[in-house]
């Protein structure tokens, strides 16, 4: 869900 997207974004940033 959105949690996964948040984790991915955190990895990119």
Swiss-Prot record:
Signal peptide residue numbers: none
GO biological processes: defense response to bacterium
Transmembrane segments: none
Residues modified to Leucine amide: 13
One GO cellular component term: extracellular region
Compartments, as annotated in UniProt: Secreted
Family recorded in the similarity comment: Belongs to the frog skin active peptide (FSAP) family. Temporin subfamily.
Function: Antimicrobial peptide.
Protein name listed in UniProt: Temporin-AVa
Species in which this protein is naturally found: Rana arvalis (Moor frog)
